[in-house]
């Protein structure tokens, strides 16, 4: 409840709750600790180029679809990528490989989705440089690493930084917890590219090359019946529709369903939420729709008809051209 209240204050410019300013001392403390963390970090350089995908705001902005797009584009251009991630929400911090059969509570929901969708090696670890070393030892053919959600992990040296936003932009422009920013907007000046998931409500004040990303919905597929797919049109008149989302910005998923003509009773959950069967009981008399990230955690829990909506990132090829040019510069150096 508190997290949702804060997000409304951060991103709705019409809301100016005086209570928010009581958190200013915490914002100054957070900013100071963040600066100290970056100052004290000793970046570890890996033997292959590293592309970091992250954001300076809290919550989901589309990093995972972008990482999948990058893996696919790099492979198409002859590169052999691997992916490292912390694996938020998992039970341990140890370095380990992620396979399609891994358990989400052991590796994290996003790394598991990346392993199932990307077709490239995926490893997780609290210390991404150590995870990267383990991945490279196990897969010596890998010649570029993607670090998912690693912008603030300064212990890992990087060659390319990609910063992701969604249509909400930088919100009220304040640091946590007064606003949604992990780092100041001025941080964008040192990034290689800014990617906005959708048309931003306000332009970001940066001269860094910017690219728009759109998430194209695919066909729904059944969680409990392999190989069965359906269009949004075919689901409209099938019965009562419900939707859940435990992602950084659940409303984005619910708006996508609306854009497909699907009217649903919605249920948001916190990002990286660990589902239990009772969480899905609200949809027992109808059809439940969810994201792919939620589906990897709900296997075996669904009592009724459950469908998943996959999405695929679409971006200008100019972005991958920019990235490949920088990677080749690293090889020459």
UniProtKB/Swiss-Prot annotation:
The keyword Transmembrane helix does not apply. It comes from Dechloromonas aromatica (strain RCB). NCBIfam families: lpxK. GO terms for cellular component: plasma membrane. The gene is lpxK. One of its GO terms (molecular function) is tetraacyldisaccharide 4'-kinase activity. Pfam families: LpxK. PANTHER family: TETRAACYLDISACCHARIDE 4'-KINASE (PTHR42724), TETRAACYLDISACCHARIDE 4'-KINASE, MITOCHONDRIAL-RELATED (PTHR42724:SF1). It catalyses: a lipid A disaccharide + ATP = a lipid IVA + ADP + H(+). It is an enzyme of class 2 (transferase). Its EC number is 2.7.1.130. This is Tetraacyldisaccharide 4'-kinase. ATP binds at residues 57-64. Pathway: Glycolipid biosynthesis; lipid IV(A) biosynthesis; lipid IV(A) from (3R)-3-hydroxytetradecanoyl-[acyl-carrier-protein] and UDP-N-acetyl-alpha-D-glucosamine: step 6/6. Keywords: ATP-binding, Kinase, Lipid A biosynthesis, Lipid biosynthesis, Lipid metabolism, Nucleotide-binding, Transferase. GO terms for biological process: lipid A biosynthetic process; lipopolysaccharide core region biosynthetic process. InterPro entries: LpxK (IPR003758), P-loop_NTPase (IPR027417). Transfers the gamma-phosphate of ATP to the 4'-position of a tetraacyldisaccharide 1-phosphate intermediate (termed DS-1-P) to form tetraacyldisaccharide 1,4'-bis-phosphate (lipid IVA). Belongs to the LpxK family.
